[in-house]
Amino acid sequence: VILDDLGNENKRMLKEKFQEEREFDFTAQDFARVRKLIYQHAGISLSDAKTDMVYSRVGRRIRTVGLNSFKDYLDWLESDQNEGEWENFTNALTTNLTSFFREEHHFPILAEHIKKLAKPIRIWCSASSTGEEPYTIAMTACEAFGTLKPPVEIIATDIDTNVLATAARGVYPFDRVSKLSEKRKKEFFQKGSGAQEGLVRVRNELRNLISFQQLNLLDNQWPIKEPFDAIFCRNVMIYFDKPTQSKILKKFVPLMKPHALLFAGHSENFLYVSTDLQLLGKTVYELKHGDGQKRQL
């Protein structure tokens, strides 16, 4: 009985959450519909705790296109003539938390790894966000080889076209690089002046190492054929359910060279959803080998 009461209380609280004073009509059915659509389109699983986030972010789109309710917007979204709005819808619900040298322990491992490889070296950053991660990979490659023109090709992809545009520009507020060493700031960035005061731009040599392109990890076919020496898929899987995680990891396997490393986020464990990988170190994986041997990092 107590458990039933708790369940009813949770339902009551959720109902009240949807009945709060809001600019747009937003029902539990609308929220369920948003969850279903973003899961089908981008594989993102939204919990009940995301109601306010959904209202806020999708509400901005409703305001922009001049509609009056979530139902009207979602009907319009699904109509044949509005394919372009799917991109805006997906961008609105994508979270982009990132920084330069985030989860820093990965980059000395990457540096040692790529110094041993045949050239040229291919690296895939599968969730580029606003560019800090692929530029960090590029900086690591430059430092590993002692040149601004290392033998490295970096493919950086993301589902969100807005953040990809930011990444390709390579322009950031100065506080984004404030925690980098003075040496790195001087070597890899140019400080803005005049109208660009307070901004920094990634040096062209770094940007030339990276090819940015839109890619949905949920797509059946990826526009990528050649295998990689390293793949970064960090803090992405936490937004997907386990079947989706397993599907994506299985598609990584043929894109990994025999010696390739796969880097995960700090709260992600790929061993639960893949039988093709083995753990090398803290959130660093490689393909399983027939002899059962494991490299030392």
Name the predicted role of every residue range:
Residues 268-297:
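Class I S-adenosyl-L-methionine
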Residues 2-124, 265:
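Conserved AdoMet
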Residues 147-232, 236-244, 269-271, 291-294:
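Extended basic-aromatic, gly/pro-enriched interface segments that bind polyanionic ligands
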Residues 118, 172, 257:
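Short conserved AdoMet
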Residues 246-258:
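A short glycine-rich, Lys/Arg-flanked "PGG" loop and its adjoining helix->strand segment in the class I
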Residues 130-147:
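Conserved SAM-binding loop of SAM-dependent methyltransferases across substrates and taxa
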Residues 259-266:
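Conserved beta-strand signature within the Rossmann-like core of class I S-adenosyl-L-methionine
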Residues 120-133, 153-155:
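Conserved class I S-adenosyl-L-methionine
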